[in-house]
Amino acid sequence: MTVKEYLGQARFLNLFLDVKLAQIKELKSQAEKSAIILNDDRGKADTLERFKQLEEKIQGEMNRLLDLKMEIIDTISRVDDDECRLILEKRFLNGQKYCEIAEDMYMSEKSVYRIQDKAFKKIVEIKNKMTVDGME
């Protein structure tokens, strides 16, 4: 996986997390409806247990996504160049377009690309160091 692909995951994590939260909300609503509709206690308990298992599975997926997002944020925060770090945060954490970043930072898009390439090299160094140090 390239650095751009790795960091690019952060842009979609919020969308995935929103989907998971909506799934849990819908699941809880269905569980409440099922509890009201089901008459026998055994059937109700089995159904509610299944809903609980499904909710736990979705929570596990959310935790995995949050862990990945925290890892990406931590990796970006380790970049020692403020300008590089700011561009990575704006692009991959805030989802800004290159032209927006260039305008915000009073530079050309070409400069944004150049600094981003420099930042990618720093990320590779950080990831390599993390692997060598056994942090990953």
What are these regions (language model features)?
Residues 100-103:
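Short alpha-helical "recognition helix" segments of helix-turn-helix
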Residues 5-8, 67, 82, 96, ...:
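Short, well-structured alpha-helical interface segments that form or flank functional binding sites
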Residues 1-78, 125-136:
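N-terminal interaction/assembly modules
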Residues 112-126:
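DNA major-groove recognition helices of helix-turn-helix
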Residues 79-94:
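Short amphipathic alpha helix immediately N-terminal
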